[in-house]
Amino acid sequence: MEENEVESSSDAAPRPGQPEEPSESGLGVCTSEAVSADSSDAATVPGLTEADDSGVGQSSDGGNHSVEEVSESISTDPLPHGCLPDSSSVSRGPVAEMPGGPPALVHSSVLPDPSMLVSDCTASSSDLGSAIDKIIESTIGPDLIQSCITVTSGEEGGAETTQYLILQGPDDGAPMASSMSTSTLANSLAAIEALADGPTSTSACLEPPEEPQGDPSSVAQQPPAPVTEELDLQSLEAMMEVVVVQQFKCKMCQYRSSTKATLLRHMRERHFRPALAAAAAATGKRGRVRKWGTSTKTTEEDRPEEEEEDDDIVDAGAIDDLEEDSDYNPAEDEPRGRQLRLQRPTPSTPRPRRRPGRPRKLPRLETSDLHDGVGQPLVSSQSTQSPPELQDLEAPSSSGLRALGKVGRGLVESGVSQSDAENAAPSCQDEADAPPRRRGRPSRRFLGKKYRKYYYKSPKPLLRPYLCRICGSRFLSHEDLRFHVNSHEAGDPQLFRCLQCSYRSRRWSSLKEHMFNHVGSKPYKCDECSYTSVYRKDVIRHAAVHSQDRKKRPDPTPKLSSFPCPVCGRVYPMQKRLTQHMKTHSTEKPHMCDKCGKSFKKRYTFKMHLLTHIQAVANRRFKCEFCEFVCEDKKALLNHQLSHVSDKPFKCSFCPYRTFREDFLLSHVAVKHTGAKPFACEYCHFSTRHKKNLRLHVRCRHANSFEEWGRRHPEEPPSRRRPFFSLQQIEELKQQHSTAPGPPLSSPGPEAPQEPAPFQSPETPPLLCPDALGGTTIIYQQGAEESTAVATQTALDLLLNMSAQRELGATALQVAVVKSEGIEAELTSTGGQPSPEDTTPRVVTLHMAESGSSVAAESQLGPSDLQQIALPSGPFGGASYSVITAPPVEGRTSASGPPYREEPPGEAAQAVVVSDTLKEAGTHYIMAADGTQLHHIELTADGSISFPSPDTLAPGTKWPLLQCGGPPRDGSEVLSPTKTHHMGGSQGSSTPPPAASHTLGLVVPQSPPSAAASSTKKFSCKVCSEAFPSRAEMESHKRAHAGPAAFKCPDCPFSARQWPEVRAHMAQHSSLRPHQCNQCSFASKNKKDLRRHMLTHTNEKPFSCHVCGQRFNRNGHLKFHIQRLHSIDGRKTGTSTARAPAQTIILNSEEETLATLHTAFQSSHGVLGTERLQQALSQEHIIVAQEQTVTNQEEATYIQEITADGQTVQHLVTSDNQVQYIISQDGVQHLLPQEYVVVPDGHHIQVQEGQITHIQYEQGTPFLQESQIQYVPVSPSQQLVTQAQLEAAAHSAVTAVADAAMAQAQGLFGTEEAVPEQIHQLQHQGIEYDVITLSDD
């Protein structure tokens, strides 16, 4: 880039204080347009290049910037480019006079030869025109001209007009022409005379890059003075010439020069003399050049060198006037100290002065009033200064050129520059372009009103024209703006306050929502529903819910928050809690202890119970019963032992996981450990980790083969947690729950069967006998062989320790199926074999209600003949009943006692009924003698026999006082024997139907003499006969007895005559534990607990099972062990009852019996006459009620067994874990029961759902010990016992004992008095029981 520019001395600005005078050449009067044009072009340079050291070409406004500009194309072509002379050369060029127009000033370099110009002042215009024509014909061609060259023309007193020429480069075709600045022309043609001598000044066209802060249109920012006449296009084209300038560029920086010597000097001083630069920096002469520059000191030595350089310049220019150009010194091209400040002639308008203060980085835009009154921005002298840090450190040239030399900046290469204003038409030169805007928000100082006109304004109107100056929010209306501004808390842009209350918020939207609390409604509302919102967009988004095009999702199922119990209505918040609660309605106890026989509903309670059976080995260490594992924690040992007997046989080999299904184990191993897919499809390559997924795959993908595949791979039923309740069972439980407080219903249960029966005959529909406790419902059918399995399985379930029957206690459901064929009747307990088709079956049931009442029913030939007897509740409701004899012809029923065969025809049948509450005061007995009458006898404590009066009966109680021929006790009509078979509708009367005409062995419980006291006080003291409601209180009372009428505290010497005083004193010792263990910190309230505790230290187990040999440290554990594991019926026994003092009634003769009963009947409302009574007591009976004295009742042996040893049959009936009586043949020694029930059809152990269903032994085979029994869980589809074996077992287990007993009792029973020796013989084993001896007369 050519950077050397020589200006004439006439262009220099005058020194301060001197008036502006035009030079003699006529060009001294120049307008500010020249200055503006040069400075504006320099201001548009995007980057600055390094200035030449010669300092030639300084043409800045104020001496800080060079008047240079770079081409827009930024050509990097090394070939020389065409340049145009600047305004100085134009102002000193010849003036060409156009024909018919004002004279035109032409640059001397445009001419091919300077001698062509007319140097004489008298040159005519025709000679000048011919010279111009030669120039155009020789140099200007159509391929080079893009526009017109800058020429100035004007008239006298008029301003000049500037036009431009764009030259095309030789290679890239980029426009590379610099604008020619205008200058003031003289009003006369005297300038031609000044130009006659030819050009003497040189002017090189520079190509500086643009400055980023500049304004590319600053040339046009001041419009030229109005001209009187303008040149046409043809005249202007005559003034054009293409000039090609060769340039030299430095490879180490962006410096360019038109001469080679200048470039070499630049390289020596800039790149090879760093010491010179440091010295120059130390002298401080590199600072900002003063606004009004002074002449620099020149030397004579540099002038010849500069003159040689001028010879090398292609376009040397011309010096207009040698006489007046005395200030020109070529030595100023070499930088020697501070550069000389060239002065320019001042324009007619005053130059803007520099403002005081530091130079600004950004230009300060100002307005100046022009002739047309329009304010146009001007770049002030201060705004055009370059920052000091951008100035060159060594070059004394203008600041603009020095800033161009910064190394390392991404600068464009300089060339022949041309501003955008040169391409514009002359008419639009006066339009001001907006300054380039920086991205982002402008600085705060540009927010004033005077700068708003330069901001970009969209042609579209603002949607929210009102702006908040505090936070910048915009609003639609002025009212919204005012409300918003007033809501600002103390002018804080991030805090808002409510104008009506003390509400504060940091969000404007929150305040808007709050304001609707004062207004009352939200402005936007949905058209289809009641939805409202503060914002309209929310309503629009909500309206999509009502759109028909949108697919509506189904409403999610509301999550249940309450789970009511279907039985009692109690509500639980969780399903798990409801499931646990439902167990309370179930009678099943699935968890049974194998050591003591206790059963539990909850597994947690069961495990806590198992901890009591774990005994320490030594040093409080516990050892596993199955292996050598030893630990110090009971719970850890229990969990270990449960792993040995777990009902989950499939165990993972990688972790402790166990399961009861093999496919679950395979899935577990695949998912958790191996990652394999063990379940593969047989029809394709599909495989999965879960068996259920394989089933789904086959059903979906191979539907045609799914049926065959399903037969080979049956689906196992899902396992669910118990208890299970069918809908019918739930309805029954609801009914029982609602009727539990009231009296029991006497009507039969619903006839709809619960279980599907294989066969149902319409002539003889099944009889449904529901158990009042909901544990068991039995359906009995007749005359169908398909029902054999049902009846047999029912009999076994009731006989062999079913959990539902354990809940019933001693009052287990007893059912007899009576077969009448001639004189035979086969009875079974809890079910039996179906009768032959030619017999007339009769079903008699006896079961206990939940409140303790019993119902005895008999049915014959269908439900229409069903007769039921409701038995009242009371302290005797938990009793067991037994039938000793059988009716002669019709048949009999039985309760919990063993049934016997009917006696041969012609023999007189005798019946003795003994209650399990025989030893209590007020015990009731029922006696049946001749099959026509049923007698109710009450045995009192004093030995008298009386009948209860109707006053003592509870309302609605139906007493089993069956009569035949006698008037009812309530005054109703007498029932004849002919109506006994059709009394199904008379069950609701207070007098029960006469079912005794066909039932002689019907056993019903006795009624309470007093419904109040006996129901609350069941236990009485043997010493003072005082009654107590609980056994524990009675035992405490007995221990406190110090005599018949004295009481003493067992823990201290305190004594008193009244039991309440001693009881109140003993309450003080309730928190004391005086009995302490000498080996540990255990302490107890009584010695008995301490004695039991001592067994844990000695590991002594004094109580052993006589069957399996297992030993226990408590007799109670042994008792439950035998009852649960070695008992055939496994009934749960009730609470022990307190017994009255010993009372024995022996009826040895008929006369004594008649007298006793006659006295009893006279004292009450008797129902039998003397003849009937004598006939009923024609046979002698022995009733023995003997209380056995046991020193320690808790340690007594309580056994419930049935023993069969061939011809000898002994039947032991128990209640409350005590043997109540033994029925045996006369002359046979009363043996203690030591054997199991013998079942002759094989020995089997069947386990169902973790419980032993039944155990069968072959007769004569040794009994298995407990340790030899292996509990193997089986599925319901697998049966260890065949159906035939079940039927045979049911027959043998239920009827074999009865058949054998009846075979031995063929004769009439005689009378034999029980002697004290015999009673003592029954006591030697510490067992309490009654003996009824049956012998021939």
Curated annotation (Swiss-Prot):
Residues 31-45, 54-63 have a biased composition (Low complexity). The keyword Nucleus applies. Residues 1-108, 198-226, 278-444, 733-767, 963-999 are annotated as: Disordered. Residues 363-372 have a biased composition (Basic and acidic residues). There is a cross-link at residue 1022 (Glycyl lysine isopeptide (Lys-Gly) (interchain with G-Cter in SUMO2)). SUPFAM superfamilies: beta-beta-alpha zinc fingers. Residues 302-332 have a biased composition (Acidic residues). GO terms for molecular function: histone methyltransferase binding; RNA polymerase II cis-regulatory region sequence-specific DNA binding; transcription cis-regulatory region binding; zinc ion binding. Disruption phenotype: Loss leads to embryonic lethality as early as 7.5 dpc. Brain-specific conditional knockout produces a brain with an essentially absent cortex lacking all cortical neurons. PROSITE patterns: ZINC_FINGER_C2H2_1 (PS00028), ZINC_FINGER_C2H2_2 (PS50157). It holds the Pfam family zf-C2H2_6. Expressed at low levels in cerebral cortex, hippocampus and cerebellum (at protein level). Residues 741-756 have a biased composition (Pro residues). A zinc finger (C2H2-type) spans 248-271, 466-488, 496-518, 524-546, 563-585, 591-613, 622-644, 650-673, 679-702, 1019-1041, 1047-1069, 1075-1097, 1103-1126. Interacts with NCOA6; may enhance ligand-dependent transcriptional activation by nuclear hormone receptors. Interacts with CNOT6. Interacts with CNOT9; the interaction is direct. Component of a nuclear receptor-mediated transcription complex composed of at least ZNF335, CCAR2 and EMSY; the complex stimulates the transcription of nuclear receptor target genes such as SOX9 and HOXA1. Within the complex interacts with EMSY and interacts (via C-terminus) with CCAR2. Interacts with members of histone H3'Lys4'(H3K4) methyltransferase complexes ASH2L, CXXC1, KMT2A/MLL1, RBBP5, SETD1A and WDR5. Belongs to the krueppel C2H2-type zinc-finger protein family. This is Zinc finger protein 335.
